[in-house]
Amino acid sequence: MSNAHDIKPLNDNIGLEEAAQGFAAIGSEPRLDVLLALVRAGHKGLTVGEIQQKTGIPASTLSHHLRFLSAARLIEQTKDGRTIHNQAAFTHIEALANFLLRECC
């Protein structure tokens, strides 16, 4: 886990490998559901419990999906005591969308 201050903004020119990793992460309906919940929450983000309430995904499975999304840099996680806050990584999500528009349209 990292602090939000440690995360470097992504260049809009992401490569094929990074784009494939991002698209693979949202290729799962539950992970897409989690990401959409975080996008809707805005920069405030959600705790793991709040995500669980909004998506209905069991805690053990949710943990797996959050790790996958974090590894793909689609979400950022910060720890505050025993609470983990999750936020959509809007800069990276935008870079991923721009990659698709640039390469495919």
Where are these regions (language model features)?
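Short, hydrophobic-biased segments on the C-terminal half of alpha helices
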Residues: 66-67
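N-terminal helix-turn-helix DNA-binding core of bacterial DNA-binding proteins
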Residues: 17-61, 80-92
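Amphipathic alpha-helical dimerization/coiled-coil segments
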Residues: 1-22, 36-40, 90-105
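Short beta-strand "wing" residues that participate in macromolecule-binding interfaces
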Residues: 77
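Glycine-centered, phosphate/nucleic-acid-interacting loop/turn motifs that mediate DNA/RNA or nucleotide
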Residues: 73
